[in-house]
Amino acid sequence: MNHIRILVVDDHEVVRGLLRHLLEAENGWEVCGEASDGDEAVERSRALHPDVIVMDAVMPGCNGFEATREIMRSTPEIPVVITTLYEYPEVLRQAQNAGALGCVGKSNTTRLLIPAVKSAVGHHPFFPPLS
């Protein structure tokens, strides 16, 4: 894949750092910005226009599902991959209903995040079963 610009959204700074490390280990991938909640994610997505957004599902204030819906309304060409600590089938449904192109359980992040981002950038869904 060519150069990919990624917006990372999570309310925990340590998690954002880990995601940045994992994503930027891929050749040509760059985390172009970070956000700590859904409202900030919507603002940054409009300002930065990343190739893909990796977003936590559960955050204070505007959560990842609400932010994804808003991003899909304003910039539907930017795919979103949801990450979640809560690995239940209902979370997959919520992610799909919000317009996300992928959903990865945090326990599988190191194994599944890169394939999920690659799929999303190609505008292909990536919804493996959650535990």
Predicted regions and their residues:
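C-terminal output helix
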Residues: 90, 108-121, 125, 129-130
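Acidic catalytic/metal-coordinating carboxylates
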Residues: 37-40, 63-66
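Active-site beta3 strand of CheY-like receiver
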Residues: 48-54
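The feature encodes the CheY-like receiver
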Residues: 60-61, 88
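Conserved acidic segment of CheY-like receiver
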Residues: 2-15, 19-23
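Short hydrophobic/Thr-rich beta-strand motif most characteristic of the beta2 strand and flanking loop
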Residues: 28-36, 44
